[in-house]
């Protein structure tokens, strides 16, 4: 149970961090 919860937490973190990095990279590229 603990591994499943940590896996979903990691997946959620990846889904929130990845778009933020992508947006920041696009902003740097535009400037």
Swiss-Prot record:
Domain of life: Eukaryota
Pfam families given in the database record: PetL
UniProt entry tagged with the keyword Hydrolase: no
GO MF term set: electron transporter, transferring electrons within cytochrome b6/f complex of photosystem II activity
GO cellular component: chloroplast thylakoid membrane; cytochrome b6f complex
Keywords noted in UniProt: Chloroplast, Electron transport, Membrane, Photosynthesis, Plastid, Thylakoid, Transmembrane, Transmembrane helix, Transport
Transmembrane segments: 3-23
Subcellular location as annotated: Plastid, Chloroplast thylakoid membrane
KW Transmembrane (keyword) present: yes
Main location: plastid
Coiled coil: none
Membrane topology according to the record: Single-pass membrane protein
GO biological-process terms attached to the record: photosynthesis
Family: Belongs to the PetL family.
Oligomer status and interactors: The 4 large subunits of the cytochrome b6-f complex are cytochrome b6, subunit IV (17 kDa polypeptide, PetD), cytochrome f and the Rieske protein, while the 4 small subunits are PetG, PetL, PetM and PetN. The complex functions as a dimer.
Task of the protein: Component of the cytochrome b6-f complex, which mediates electron transfer between photosystem II (PSII) and photosystem I (PSI), cyclic electron flow around PSI, and state transitions. PetL is important for photoautotrophic growth as well as for electron transfer efficiency and stability of the cytochrome b6-f complex.
Name of the protein this chain belongs to: Cytochrome b6-f complex subunit 6
Name of encoding gene: petL
């Amino acid at each position: 149970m603990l591994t499943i919860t940590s896996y979903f937490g990691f997946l959620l973190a990846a889904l929130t961090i990845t778009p933020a990095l992508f947006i920041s990279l696009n902003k740097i590229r535009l400037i």
